[in-house]
């Protein structure tokens, strides 16, 4: 059961007895589970914890909610908040975190139609666009947020984006007709726009022609509102500003003085809103011979001039956002670019109130996407807001497919009487091609993904930016504060600006931030949250260089900044989008449903001659000469496949070499290939080998995430070096590369809208969750999954999702079709003794050494004699059996049993460690280095981060060089000559923890060493659990367990202490 569910159960208990946890503490824990690290506080950015909710009627018979809330960390001071009128319908519960907006000079807080605002889950930032779109249909807004990125690109969207950019550049420069024409041409030549034209199969000329139709309106608007002249000559409008002392509209002349910012990014922790304002303008309002200057939002629209409630609502919300940076603008502007018509949009209390209520309902729907009939019962997906009865709105809705699919698969409303009649037929029409098994697959994976995204580790929002000072957060290693800009900002291209920062005072702190990390840049001043997003380009002890999406040179030079790592662990938009695509009524989706959900048998071609071109036979034969028999068998199986092939890459069997050979053979045969994996490093490892064979390929993805030796093959670098500025040249680039490489998350690239590959190869497929792995498969006729389900599965944090089957990869799911499976069994990593462990535990003797040299290889210790002499200093240890056995190169495997030492574990602050094991690891590491083993050839593995930290600290204080200390997961796919494994757990109550119960992690740990493997732990504690019991049976039979004798325990501290002082 997840922690949040356990808390719900406890909260239901009426009497917990004397030892019961106080109810207030349970509510606080529930709040922490929903929003980790929230700090309760009063003031402008107040955060209150709801302790109790009572619904009652006032003296007039109207319903109101009485909330008992507290903002004190010790929860001793309780405050009453009364919600009246429409606010009483807000779905607030005990344990929720809320923000109260208004005046509370005397208690209680009273929030009603006329005064104050109530913000539910204020640390959940929701875009103003999403709130505005929920006006007509809340269901659509929830679906758009849930299936983010599934909205198809359109011609209108592209033209709108281009027009926005032309206007935004012009307002900072000039609206002269000839300059507008230049700006339009420049913008159309930007590679990012050329890519969208390619996606939509449009030409530059037709887009330019349409853009040019708007340009005269741009000039006219500027002539009306930005020219020089007396105030009486500026356009007159009706506008009310409460700060003038009147709420009535009265005529005034409007002069737009200048543009102050473009795409100003504002996050509001007061209102739980975020957004980017198209243009922030300085405006003079001339009325009755008086002038008032205001900084106001200007929203640009390229569609039909409707002055609709959605459009006006966006402007109202931007006025709320503007209050985070400056005084209340009280109104904003709505400009339709086609006509040049600009409308004033007053932001009155009523409009803001109703929009914030909508925002609360949207936040509640997004947060509570999983429900239970009762605490402790099985999770299920919550129903979405009701389907509306508005045929016209639904007809043009981009989420109609997902709406119908969710209704059928999750809400099971195929013939529900509650659905409007007009929509019932639409739901059936959208989903009639789907069978029950397809709907169940969709529903199950939606549930599992949602559970995973709502785990505490994935719930962390960005609230630390506004709730925790940078000086405090720096200790976590994920933030650097007190930064100032040092050099002029340089423009890489539109949307990419290079910024250099250094510490205002002192050197850079120790940090986990490194090149390639996503970051959010904010000002340390309260009003400057989330100014820009981007990546760390370069970082050292003196300075940090960042590539940001906005040019911040307009901010004062004295502005002090902070960088926060952007965590994106809980983002499920891509896998949910893939699931939605799998349910579409298209041929690729239908075929994948048959293979993956219905388990249709994969088909194969009978004769190799029918797929192997005559002129490629010699090339293929030469490539095959360098492969072993299982690898050659894999090549044949792939060439004969009509659907898919699974290649099982057992440890050390040359998986990367096999994939490289496969790509070369497919290329020689004239096939196009899409090469993917989950990580950039896995993709680049293959490409590094391909590059040595002079095989051409196109690498998609941002250059700074790609291996330095592969960057010259990226689309970004090629476009830059060739100065690509036309669609014809971009198409030529795409068409000239039959081999394309990207990660599984990069499948939204425009190239895939018009290109289908003959083969898709997915490396590390057994580590990728099914919906993520699906993405690239839509764009190929056949696919090859390479992996090993006996090694690490997809990482799943949520226990319930794991129990439902989320850790089953597509590789594992399809492995039941044995005709499609080829096993690589000849390995070139481990010597015979180390290999025998994995053969016994996992592979049923299938693994074999590739040569006698591999089988008999031992750890090279050129200075072993000197090391043994130095150990003579410790007379009691010089001839100890365990130490002699460990150091002996001809003993490749040994388990050091700590039962008699003793070596008890420590559990503190949720972390598990074992200091004695850590000290032993450091002692052994130091001894092997003295014996001549290079620090770079040694790897230390431990299952717990706390243990890793202790070992790393001890190594840092010793004379030992740079030795890699990491978890099993980080060592997947890699090896070292010497591996030392600390199992950590040593207790009498049988507690082992989830990590050590996973036999696949154990298998990975046992197969990382090439020449020597040293395991360290408590046999009595570990043997209770399979497969560790099986491991000990084998080790005992081979006499590979060495007991650390009790008589040596007394001297152990002395020896280890001396070791660290050396």
Swiss-Prot record:
CDD domains in the record: DEXXQc_DNA2, DNA2_N-like, SF1_C_Upf1
Keyword DNA-binding: yes
Note accompanying the cofactor annotation: Binds 1 [4Fe-4S] cluster.
Gene Ontology BP term (one): DNA replication checkpoint signaling
Location in the cell: Nucleus; Mitochondrion
EC number: 3.1.-.-, 3.6.4.12
Major localisation: nucleus
InterPro entries: Dna2/JHS1_DEXXQ-box, DNA2/NAM7-like, DNA2/NAM7-like_C, DNA2/NAM7_AAA_11, DNA2_Rift, DNA_replication_fac_Dna2_N, P-loop_NTPase, PDDEXK-like_dom_sf
Keywords for the protein's UniProt record, in alphabetical order: 4Fe-4S, Acetylation, ATP-binding, DNA damage, DNA repair, DNA replication, DNA-binding, Endonuclease, Helicase, Hydrolase, Iron, Iron-sulfur, Metal-binding, Mitochondrion, Multifunctional enzyme, Nuclease, Nucleotide-binding, Nucleus
Nucleus is among the record's keywords: yes
Binding annotation for ATP: 649-656
Post-translational modification: Acetylated by EP300, leading to stimulate the 5'-3' endonuclease, the 5'-3' helicase and DNA-dependent ATPase activities, possibly by increasing DNA substrate affinity.
Catalytic activity: ATP + H2O = ADP + phosphate + H(+)
Cofactor: [4Fe-4S] cluster
Pfam families referenced in this protein's UniProt entry, alphabetically: AAA_11, AAA_12, Dna2, Dna2_Rift
Chain residue ranges for the region called Helicase activity: 521-1062
Binding site for [4Fe-4S] cluster: 137, 394, 397, 403
Quaternary structure annotation from Swiss-Prot or TrEMBL: Interacts with BLM and WDHD1.
PANTHER family the record matches: DNA REPLICATION ATP-DEPENDENT HELICASE_NUCLEASE DNA2 (PTHR10887:SF433), DNA2/NAM7 HELICASE FAMILY (PTHR10887)
Task performed by this protein: Key enzyme involved in DNA replication and DNA repair in nucleus and mitochondrion. Involved in Okazaki fragments processing by cleaving long flaps that escape FEN1: flaps that are longer than 27 nucleotides are coated by replication protein A complex (RPA), leading to recruit DNA2 which cleaves the flap until it is too short to bind RPA and becomes a substrate for FEN1. Also involved in 5'-end resection of DNA during double-strand break (DSB) repair: recruited by BLM and mediates the cleavage of 5'-ssDNA, while the 3'-ssDNA cleavage is prevented by the presence of RPA.
Protein name: DNA replication ATP-dependent helicase/nuclease DNA2
Organism: Mus musculus (Mouse)
